[in-house]
Amino acid sequence: MLHHIFQKLLLPAVLAGTMLADTVAPAVSLAAQAATQPDSYHDDWLHVNDNAEIVDKDGNPVWITGCNWFGYNVGSQVFDGVWSQNMHDMLRQIADHGFNFLRIPMSTEILLQWKNGDPDPATPKVNQYTNPELTEEGIEGGTIKYSFDIWNMAVKWCRELGIKIMIDIHSAETASAGHQISLWYTDKFSTEDWCDALAWFADYYKDDDTILAIDLKNEPHGTADVKDQMAKWDDSTDPTNWKYAAETCAARVLEKNPELLVMVEGTEVYPKEGYDWTAPRIDYTTMTEYYYGTWWGGNFRGAKKYPIDLGKYQSQLVYSPHDYGPLVWEQKWFYDGFTQETLLKDCWYDNWFFLQDEGVAPLLMGEWGGFMDGGKNEQWMTYLRDFMIENRIHHTFWCFNENSGDTGGLVYDNFGKWDEEKYALVKPALWQDDNGKFISLDHTIALGANGISLSDYYGSGNSSTTAPDSKIIAGDVNSDKLVNGVDLTLMRQNITKWQSTEDVLTASPQDTNGNGVFSVADIVLLTQYLLGKDVTLKSYTS
């Protein structure tokens, strides 16, 4: 998932190098130039306070509300979509739509390539006619730049647009299916390689607070069916112990830049009471399951007994679960009639929400999203969105890309158009002030064309503990603060499924006539309202 406006002068033209026959000049650290950089390159670092809140340098709570944009991890050597659209313009659109943070999947392999100055294994997938800025000559149809040069242009543009960045190691090896590998190492790239890559990256950008965070590894997972490929969470130093690996790598990263936020994801499984990691996944004679299972990277049950310990860097720790809906996988908690309350009871609380609820550490939902199906998947997205708003859970929506097979994206038509219906669902969960201005995580740079800076927000008298709007607008089914034909369509889709169910009887936007029941009469009333008839919709305060 990208945005900016010019004031904080760009990073000194990093790596404006050119590709030679077989080699590229090694990446040079920016540390030597730190003395000449303005203080505004170091004033946006974030940390965690004693209340498990992410706060800025002045102790003001912030809300990270971003999206994911992949490509570097799959072999494109650039963001996907730059093969057709202008990269700068897409970043500008992301900023203008209110996303203040980008989670960008990478691989250990590409970071080590950049660290060593190795040539691109393939030409970056850039349309040099729509992206003349990404060519050596700066002209349409020119020679495409080295991928690290292009990356640094993206960092520069994000800074100018007010977007902050977090990379994640999506996989050790660059591959479109790399995320299927359960661990952070392979036969080709070791745990040490992974640590080296992230330590180099942290050091390289330690004087640029555009890079605010690192997500150490995407979705550690695996089950007891293949024990040597199962990410576990305990107090051992075993090579597959994710807790130990995360603490080790985080120490390397924070030694280079102690100001970075470090995101630690969960595992897939954790042993049930009375069992340990030696247990099989299931006893097929009795069909007894010995592990609690959930989404890849979404299981933090181990952190209750074995919390992540970053020592003197504990203030930089954020736990980062992932959560998805039934169109990704029909999990057992997606039974008929599931609600936000049943999801919290059956999945969310014991797997991850306890960490924030008990004040252990803040949460950033690193991936959530899916197709707009007018049914169960959309219900799940709405429930999770509302839960994150209510509890101020940080998040990065999956994803900007249209080419995510499990979920689709925020754009379509070869990255050329926005899915306005999906964006309307996400928009209420983006950080905004009372006037609907999107809030940047940068103290001096506003977020895109429709936002304000962090200093503008707190300087205008906004409370650091601003609560979400509790007013429920009748007819605003998708919670975008508008009542229009999209809401009418959703009500028509929901009528058969939701009529007379308990969770729409109180303070429901679908109960437009205020009689406590969602029925065809509510759809008729909304239709009349949209046609300009002299009718009144009932609103509530929750």
PLM regions with names:
Residues V62-W69, N100-M106, I110, K164-S171, ...:
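Structural recognition of the beta-strand scaffold that forms the well-ordered cores
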Residues L2-V28:
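Sec-dependent N-terminal signal peptides of Gram-positive bacterial secreted proteins and lipoproteins
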Residues W83, Y185, C195-L212, K217-N391:
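Extracellular glycoside hydrolase catalytic/binding regions
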Residues A21, A25-A31, S464-S542:
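Cellulosome-associated attachment modules in secreted, modular CAZymes
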Residues M106-W114, W151-V155, E160, K164-W184, ...:
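Aromatic-lined carbohydrate-binding surfaces of glycoside hydrolases
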Residues G375-S470:
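Aromatic-rich peripheral "rim/lid" segments of glycoside hydrolase catalytic domains that contact
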Residues G75-G81, I110-Y146, A175-F189, D225-K232, ...:
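Surface-exposed, active-site-proximal loop segments in enzymatic domains
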Residues L30-R103, W114-L134, G141, A467:
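N-terminal carbohydrate-binding accessory modules
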